[in-house]
Amino acid sequence: MRKFFGTDGIRGIVNEILTPELAYKLSRAIIGYFKDVKKKKVIIGSDTRNSKDMLKSALIAGFTSGGMDILDVGVVSTPSLSYLVKKYDDVLLGIMISASHNPVEYNGIKIFKSDGFKLEDNVEATIEEYILREDDYFRASPREIGVIYNFTQALEDYKNYLKEIIGEDFRGYKIMLDCAFGSLSEIAPTVFKELGAEVIAYNTNYNGININDNCGAVYPEIGRNLFLKSGAHIGFTYDGDGDRVIAFSEDGEIVDGDVLIGIFAKYLKERGLLRGNKIVGTVMTNLGLEEYLKRLGIGLIRAKVGDRYVLEEILKNNLNLGGETSGHIILFDYMPTGDGLLTSLFLLKILKERGIKLSDLAKEIRIFPQVHEKIHIKDIYITEEDEKEFRGIAEEVINGKNIRYIVRKSGTEPVIRITVEGDVPKEDLTNIALEIKNRIIDFLRRSKRQDLPSKGVS
């Protein structure tokens, strides 16, 4: 089991798990791993958390001590950093300091290669070994120590790239944006305005501690209330680092990632642009989307949860569309990672081209009810045998009913996530999910003897 890297880089509570010492050791370990590579520049960006400067300083100290120059792009979205790393030929890596949708107590470090993709699992594992080894890796001579460059103007390249992809004038559209006090707080309203839309933007005045605080893509019901108040034609709510988005149709309905993928799949197929006639979802992808795709003659490949695993399947099967219920959508012809701003622009492009409302497209996809529960498991190591036991508990509770379930340990938080789904009343699913949750808590209490929350409390 890995000590530092999860499904999306290194992530944890700041100054408990993710410390400046760890950030420094990480950059020194990267110096050791890439010691024979001639490229000597690293792009560093972050979301808006107050811990960004502390972690950035530690990373920069490690990189510059090894002779790496730093291109500091400031506050950026994760997908924009991925784009910039690929665009500039002399850049070795991109470092994104962000914990995505997590609250401000968390932060994370994501590493991108020069092709814009995240590091492979085996490379992360080797770098982790280097961290634990604590060797004093290469140090540059005084004349060769790296320097820091302000590179914030590079965001203009990303902005222009998005506008080039869309190629539309959105005059006449009134757009609501919930920017979650995160990375898209400035650039998202600007891009929509430059394309002619009238923009009503909420949650843009970030202060370092309000990122994702009862706002953004993790809280779509709150975003829906903002949308209804705004009087806009369509709304979008992003997460803290801008790699996911949830939409709101003109009638106030929440349009999640599964529905967005269905809309994009149909649009691309009708134009002969859907590569392989398949798309990639995850184990969480709603059965309603799967049935809709079948009617269109489109296949669905289910990956593990996490946009990196969606991308793996896209690459393995030579496809160009994939995503998650949470709103990570990969439009691979344009971007190798989920991009909330690109996704929202692309959706509006479709609506304008077709002269149609979002509700008209969304209602074609009947999403089955889902219920989610979670169990906090701080400091509890979950084994494969435990996970097998969880599945057995779920199957016993469901008892042959036509209900799909997923029980899994989160790759980004210390929780076990439980999802049940089926074409049955939501109340039935809620009862089943709670029963599974309570039985798993009982099992963990017996087997791990840990102080877990009481029954029914997540």
UniProtKB/Swiss-Prot annotation:
Entry annotation: catalytic residues: 100
Top enzyme class, one word, equals isomerase
Could you tell me the Gene Ontology terms of the biological process aspect for this record? carbohydrate metabolic process; peptidoglycan biosynthetic process; UDP-N-acetylglucosamine biosynthetic process
Cofactor(s) recorded in Swiss-Prot or TrEMBL: Mg(2+)
Annotated Gene Ontology MF terms?
magnesium ion binding; phosphoglucosamine mutase activity; phosphomannomutase activity
Q: Give the cofactor note text.
A: Binds 1 Mg(2+) ion per subunit.
Q: Catalytic activity, per the record?
A: alpha-D-glucosamine 1-phosphate = D-glucosamine 6-phosphate
The UniProt PTM text for this protein says: Activated by phosphorylation.
Its cellular-component GO annotations read: cytosol
Pfam families according to UniProt: PGM_PMM_I, PGM_PMM_II, PGM_PMM_III, PGM_PMM_IV
Keywords assigned by UniProt?
A: Isomerase, Magnesium, Metal-binding, Phosphoprotein
Name the source's superkingdom: Bacteria
The UniProt record lists the EC number as 5.4.2.10
Residues annotated as binding Mg(2+) are 100, 239, 241, 243
PROSITE patterns given for it?
PGM_PMM
Sites of Phosphoserine modification: 100
The record describes the protein's role as: Catalyzes the conversion of glucosamine-6-phosphate to glucosamine-1-phosphate.
Family assignment from sequence similarity: Belongs to the phosphohexose mutase family.
**What NCBIfam families does the record tag this protein with?**
glmM
The protein's name is Phosphoglucosamine mutase
